[in-house]
Structures are given as C-alpha cells and as structure tokens.
Amino acid sequence: MYKITKGLDLPISGAPNQVIETAAAAKTVAVIGPDFHGMKPTMLVKEGDKVKKGQIIFTDKKTEGVNYTAPASGTVIEINRGERRVFQSLVIRVEGDESETFTSYSGSELKSLERSKVVDNLVNSGLWTSFRTRPFSKVPEIASVPNSIFVTAIDTNPLAASPEVVLADQAEAFADGLTVLTRLTEGKVFLCKASGAKIPTTSDVTVEEFSGVHPAGLAGTHIHFLDPVNDKKTVWSINYQDVVAIGKLFVTGELSVERVISVAGPQVKKPRLVRTQVGVSLNDLLAGELSEGDNRVISGSVLSGRKAFGPFAYLGRYHNQVSVLLEGRERQMMHYLRAGVEKHSIMNVFLSKLTGKKSFDMTTTTNGSDRTMLPLGNFERVMPLDILPTQLLRALVVNDTEQAQKLGALELDDEDLALCTYSCSGKFEYGPILRDCLTLIEKEG
C-alpha cells in the first residue's frame, strides 16, 4: 500500500450524500471539444441531421482513425465554434432511443480475444477515447501499445463520489471490462483503489492500494509510483466508469453512456449522487437544485474542473462530478486585518486553524490579485511526487521546456498541479501553463 502524506484534503462544505438517485432523462447532450487535447475534428454530420446513439459524428484529423460517437440519439442542433473556428461543442437534442450495435462476445471469449478485435470494437463504438496517454494526456493513436494500463478506481477529489458505491451493482460489467483491458497490453493492468475499498477485480490485473490525502486518487500519482513514464515510454489511464462501459459493450454489443456523478458544493441545496449520462446538459440537470446567488457551475472538481457555461454547459467526457460555488465578486473592506475565522489557509495564518472548523463555504475568490511567485514551501507541502516542485513551476512559468522536461513535466497532467495553484501566493494557474508547455514539447521535441 502507498500512503500519501503530502497533499491536501480541501475542507469545502457541501459534501454529497453517498446514495445514488436517478436524474430526469437528458433533454440535450453534447460532446465538448476542449475535453480532448490536440483534437481537430473532421465533421461527418451537420446541424439538423438525425443521429443514432453510437453513430460516428466526427473523426480526428490529427490522430488518424479515432472516432467520436454520439452519446444519444436525436437531432444535431448546434455545432459551436469559437475564434479561428476552433471546435467548442456539438449539441444533440435527445429524441428516441435508436442506437448502433457493435460486436458482442460471451464472457468466456473475452480472455482470448485478439487485440485487433478489441481495438476495432473500441474504435467503432467511440470508447477508444476513454483512454488517455501519459505523457501528454491525449487519446492514444490506434497503432500504439502502452507499457501498462492504469484503472483509476479511487477518487480523492473534493466532493467526489465513492467508486465503491458506484460499482456496488456493476461488479460483473467492471470485471468484464478489466478482462478486455488485459488484451490491449503485454504489460500490467494496474487497478488502483483506496485502502480497504471493496472494488471488483480479476486474477489478471495487479491491485494496488493508496491511502492518505489528495492527490492519492489521481492517475498521475499512481503512474509516478508504479510505472513512471518518459519521452520513450507511454502508459494509458482510464476511469473506472469507462471500464464498466467497455465491459457492457463487449458482452451486450451496446454502447453504455450511463454516468453516476456527484452534484455537490456550498451552493447545492441537496448534495448527492445522481445517475445520468455522459455529456448531459448541466443547465437541465441543475434546474431547481441551487441556492440563490451568482453561482459558478464547474464540470469536474473545484480544483481542476472547467467552468460550465454557454457552449460548454455540459458534463465533461472525463468528469465524474459537478461542483457549484458562489462567485466571489465582492471584496471585503480591510480584509487583511480580519482574523479569518471563515477562511482556510494551508499556511495556517488564519484564526480558523485554532477554532477547529471542519469545512468552509468557499467561493471563487482568489483573495488577492496576481503577484510574484514566492518560494515559501507551499508547493512542497502539497506535492507527493519525487520531483522539485518549485523549480519545475518556475521553469514552466518562464516556458523553459528543456528544463521542465528534466524536472518531470512529462509525468504530469493539469490536475496534478491543481493543489500547487490553490496554494500559490502569486495566484498562478499552473494547469494551463503546464498544458501550453506540453503542447510545445510535443510539437518541437
């Protein structure tokens, strides 16, 4: 077991009740462009077209052969693009239940499937996009083979759903999905779970337990300790709910888009787990669920999710939670003289440290303006990986890609630096800075 002692469990209020309720059927769903790093679509549908669930709606120009499929049947009502025609989202109004069918197999056949058949089924159904590579956190190329595969069946993000609860009634499909994954690599399939958690498994996978504070549940943490990557070595990671979808695909021949997510945060009236689907409209899902005020809806974690608004107001492809905070637009008079009873600080400069307050109604305020990055030891407190965080972050900020590679940038994804962003007195957003650096490294070598 790996015990993570450096990090932070964010003390935010609005934790969800770990009981699953079924949400109303989705009215609109979407595929969001920025969820897929470096993807450039070739559209196969246009506004007004009817589509079936599982039908290919676009392919990736940059990664030949990768298909993106419709998460529901209905009518394409929007294809949103931003500046320079950058793809933002494709929105489908849900109508009917028509769906494509794919190749199915018996449970006994899964252990001996040829790799090519597994790849074909995943690509045709669009579930190939469930995988993300490390380095670069992109959808893998069709011909690529990973050194190992990591199944993330632990979630230490603030306000997250418990994988143990979500998988309680999905044991068979999850086990089938794990068996399918073993056909994709000659290396190990690591099942990473919380210490003592009752997660279904099979004899063909390697089970590893992690405990302690966030980021104990991130794929980047698991990869760092179990099978570190470099510029010549690639591994893949996949979320536990996508493993369930893969298991169902290969046994039933149908594309499962079900997703159990946490709807939580200080502004949610009834924080809980809901059963919905990939790409669901968050405007519809949260109707009547929020307290009054200027709220920010976040698809994903409060630490590393994205603001869900306009063409992006839908559940992200890789997100298992929706978080809602109050916009922190109001500034307190002479805030620097206040005791900070209602504020959290990792540097223990507020009185809240002495009062023993367990959770805080956090907002989006940064409590100050942009300033110089200061090496105060904060980054070392929240970074459990065997890297030099202050030096790495400095290299990222000045765009020194060569030094960043030497200091471990290739091991990281945006979410791995979220706690560094939270603890930075200079208010730097290290996730986007890392992403720009990784894009440049991939382009220039």
Curated annotation (Swiss-Prot):
NCBIfam families: nqrA, PRK05352.1-2. Keywords: Ion transport, NAD, Sodium, Sodium transport, Translocase, Transport, Ubiquinone. It catalyses: a ubiquinone + n Na(+)(in) + NADH + H(+) = a ubiquinol + n Na(+)(out) + NAD(+). Pfam families: NQRA_2nd, NQRA_N, NQRA_SLBB. Gene3D superfamilies: 2.40.50.100. GO terms for biological process: sodium ion transport. Belongs to the NqrA family. It comes from Marinomonas sp. (strain MWYL1). NQR complex catalyzes the reduction of ubiquinone-1 to ubiquinol by two successive reactions, coupled with the transport of Na(+) ions from the cytoplasm to the periplasm. NqrA to NqrE are probably involved in the second step, the conversion of ubisemiquinone to ubiquinol. Its EC number is 7.2.1.1. It comes from the Bacteria. This is Na(+)-translocating NADH-quinone reductase subunit A. One of its GO terms (molecular function) is oxidoreductase activity, acting on NAD(P)H, quinone or similar compound as acceptor. InterPro entries: NqrA, NQRA_2nd, NqrA_C_domain, NQRA_N, Single_hybrid_motif. SUPFAM superfamilies: Single hybrid motif (SSF51230). Composed of six subunits; NqrA, NqrB, NqrC, NqrD, NqrE and NqrF. The gene is nqrA. It is an enzyme of class 7 (translocase).
